[in-house]
Amino acid sequence: IGSNSTKNRIIDGLQKVKLDKFFKPEQVYSFDLVKNPKPYPDIYLKVVKENNLNKDETIIIEDSVIGIKAAVNAGIKVIGFTAGGHWHENRDEKELLEAGAIFVTNDYNKIDKIIEQY
């Protein structure tokens, strides 16, 4: 996880939605670990480097325009997710596509199928 939030807030959020069992604390990257926050690519480049990931084989799931821009700036494919906590009804999916998302969905169940296509 790469976020512009604090590590404690990220972990609290994961616990609230019962996703904390999927992420170890060392897999949570907060803005204070990098020089520049999103939309700069720093956080995603750090995640890729520290986890020995190949950018071409990595897909980021983002719920904000600024996060999508960070992924694009890092050279990593990104899926826009509109059911996230930052999603507001007045925001158009078009914004996420224009920011560089390869696909936009509001359905958790579609993410696996989208990833398989890329």
Report the location of each language-model feature.
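Asp-based, Mg2+/Mn2+-dependent phosphohydrolase catalytic module
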Residues: 6-118
